[in-house]
Amino acid sequence: MTQHLVLAGGGHAHMVSLAHLRDFVELDWRVTVIGPSDYHYYSGMGPGMLGSTYEPDEIRFATRAQVEAQGGIFVRDTIVAVDPKQRRLALASGAQVDYDLVSFNTGSSVQLPEISGDQERIFTVKPIERLYEAREVIATQSTLRPLKVAVVGGGPAGAEISG
């Protein structure tokens, strides 16, 4: 009987498993990777992408392509609930995924408080691809007028972004 392995997220902790996904498939495992993006971005290079040192293709891993090339299934979605008794994951799309074995590597996210004003000009550092969007807005808007940019947060990411 085929068992179902689900990798929740395609981040660093799953890189070795993703590189050897075909081994699981050849052992008759059905392998599904669930993630919010077809790519996984290396967060350590995010500030360099913001500063135009790197382009997105230089700091990302093609998760979907890697999974599908090895016989796995990639689902672009987000897990919103886990039922460990039923071994079932609920996805943001409304779909449900049953599993025999699941591993979580979903990374971090930034939850913004309610903020009034121009939401289109507020960028979080996660997901990392938002830094590219910020870079494009800054590049476009800075040709029109001098910009005032605020970095909120004093941790390592805030220091790197403001530097």
List each model region and its residues.
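Divalent metal-dependent hydrolysis catalytic cores, especially in the metallo-beta-lactamase
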Residues: 153
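FAD-binding core/adjacent interface of flavoenzyme oxidoreductases
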Residues: 1-2, 72-150
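Broad hydrophobic/π-residue packing in well-ordered secondary structure
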Residues: 33, 39-42, 47, 97-102, ...
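Glycine-/small-residue-rich active-site loops that bind phosphorylated ligands and cofactors
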Residues: 13, 81, 157
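Beta1-alpha1 glycine-rich phosphate/pyrophosphate-binding loop at the start
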Residues: 1-73, 149, 160-163
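Short, electropositive alpha-helical surface patch
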Residues: 91, 156-163
